[in-house]
From Swiss-Prot:
Residue ranges that the UniProt entry lists as topological domain Periplasmic: 1
Entry-linked NCBIfam families: septum_zipA
Key words of the record: Cell cycle, Cell division, Cell inner membrane, Cell membrane, Membrane, Transmembrane, Transmembrane helix
Residue spans, topological domain Cytoplasmic: 23-289
GO biological process, alphabetically ordered: division septum assembly; FtsZ-dependent cytokinesis
Source organism superkingdom: Bacteria
Name this polypeptide is given: Cell division protein ZipA
Tagged with keyword Nucleotide-binding: no
Gene: zipA
Comp. bias regions, Basic and acidic residues: 64-77, 85-106, 123-141
Length: 289
């Protein structure tokens, strides 16, 4: 029986499809069980908050009310210029009560992450190149005063605010760890090692978190902030902070606002980046002078 051109094409097509299916099966099997964290740039494609909600400006009242948004003030944030030793002394009594709770704090590896969902953060520490240990020690001993603070606030759209357990789970997935001044910090390493890149405080006074009562804790807003001078690679640290804030707002139904209490837009984020570039330029000019 003579095989025509049509039959040959059908046979070749079947072989190609089988090869593709086999290759896909091999790749899926090879990558099974591996948890990868990557900075998800796809969140930049999320619709701006202006398109989903009308612009809301925080009102002037500072008295907490379940029907009003909290009054956010940059001065309410913990001082970025406070030394670690001062933070330890001022919170030593409270820290003693929370040590036991911190032992039970879920670790990154203990979280039930959705492997099929978008991965936002990288577990690789080489995103922030490490300096020599001697240089790191010198920097810790002589920390320069903070000249500028970049603030991104996330405000809950729900009157009940962000619930403690859900908030804790979300920020732990973003690599933040409970630490100095009873607030959360994002270090170079997802494990909580290395220099602090940025921090997150409770935007409602007194501005701290109590892990001993986290199950009953709730807040209407939190504030992410990055001080300049601060991390050795501020632009990369800022990108990680933006991703953490967007992740929280996206998953817990929050709204991003800038340091002027206006809705955060792509233009606002770009303006923040320009502030970092300008600060680095001024710092370089001062060093040369």
């Amino acid at each position: 029986m003579e095989i025509g051109l049509r039959e040959w094409l059908i046979v070749i097509g079947i072989i190609v499809i089988a090869g593709i299916l086999f290759d896909g099966w091999r790749r899926m099997r090879g990558s099974k069980g591996k948890l990868k964290f990557r900075l998800d740039r796809s969140f930049s494609n999320l619709p701006d908050e202006e398109e989903t909600t009308s612009a809301e400006v925080l009102g002037p009242p500072r008295v907490l009310d379940t029907h009003k948004e909290p009054q956010l003030d940059e001065h309410d944030l913990p001082s970025m210029s406070a030394s670690p030793r001062e933070g330890k002394r001022s919170n030593s009594d409270k820290r003693g009560n929370s040590d036991k709770k911190r032992k039970d704090e879920p670790q990154q590896g203990d979280l039930n992450l959705d492997l099929d969902g978008p991965s936002l953060f990288t577990g690789r520490d080489d995103d922030f190149p490490d300096d020599k240990p001697a240089q790191r020690i010198t920097e810790d001993k002589d920390l320069p005063p903070v000249e500028e603070v970049l603030v991104i606030s996330v405000i809950s759209r729900s009157e009940g605010g962000f619930k403690g357990p859900a908030l804790l789970q979300n920020i732990l997935e973003s690599g933040l760890r409970f630490g100095e001044m009873d607030i959360f910090h994002r270090h170079e390493s997802m494990a909580g090692n290395g220099e602090v890149l940025f921090s997150m405080a409770n935007a409602v006074k007194p501005g701290v978190f109590d892990l001993d009562d986290i199950d009953h804790f709730s807040t209407r807003a939190v504030s992410f902030f990055l001080g300049l001078p601060g991390p050795r690679h501020p632009k990369q640290a800022f990108d990680v902070m933006v991703a953490a804030a967007r992740k929280l707002a996206h998953e817990l139904d929050g709204e991003l606002k800038d340091d002027q209490r206006s809705v955060m837009t792509a233009q606002t984020i770009e303006h923040y980046r320009q502030r970092i570039v300008e600060f680095e330029r001024r710092a370089l000019t001062q060093r040369r002078g």
